[in-house]
C-alpha cells in the first residue's frame, strides 16, 4: 500500500534579505505542491525584507544562535571546561588563519542546540556561503537525507573551499 503522507523538507537559511538566494527560495516555495510536501523554513532571524513573501503554507521557525564569546563564557559557568577549551582552540585557529569560516562552523556545530525531535525526510542548507547555515543543516537538524544548494559561483569565496570539502 502506498504511503500518502506528505514528505517533510526543511530549508535552512540565515535571513530573508533581498538577494538572489532568497528570491530563488521564494520562487521554489511557491512552486511546491503542498499536498505532497510539508515544508519548514529555519531562519536565524525572521526580520528580513523578503520575509512577508514566504508562502503562508510554510512553517517558519527560528534557530537559536549566540556569539562565540558568550558561548565560551556559558561553557565555563557550566563547568564544561573541555567545550570551553575547544572554543578557545578554534578561536585561536581562526585568528591564526585569518579565517572566520572555521570559527563560525565550529560554533554552529558545538553551540547551537538541536532544534527538536522532528526528523525530516530531507534537510537543505540553502546558503552555501554561510558556514553556520551549512553546519546547522548538517549537524543540528535531524534528517534522513542532507543537501547543499549552491547558488552562484563557488569560486567567489575561496576561503570556503576547504570547509566545503569536509561536508
Label the model's feature ranges.
Residues 1-6:
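N-proximal low-complexity "stem/linker" segments adjacent to membrane-targeting elements
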Residues 8, 121-122:
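Structural motif
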Residues 11-18, 31, 35-98:
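N-terminal strand-loop element at the rim of the active site
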Residues 14, 127-128, 150-153:
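Histidine-centered beta-alpha loop that forms part of the nucleotide-sugar donor binding/catalytic region
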Residues 22-27:
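A conserved mid-protein helix/loop that constitutes part of the nucleotide-sugar donor-binding site
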Residues 100-115, 123-143:
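An aromatic- and histidine-rich active-site surface loop
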Residues 109-119, 150-167:
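Membrane-proximal helix-turn-helix segments that form the acceptor-binding/catalytic region
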Residues 142-145, 165-167:
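Active-site-proximal region of nucleotide-activated glycan assembly enzymes
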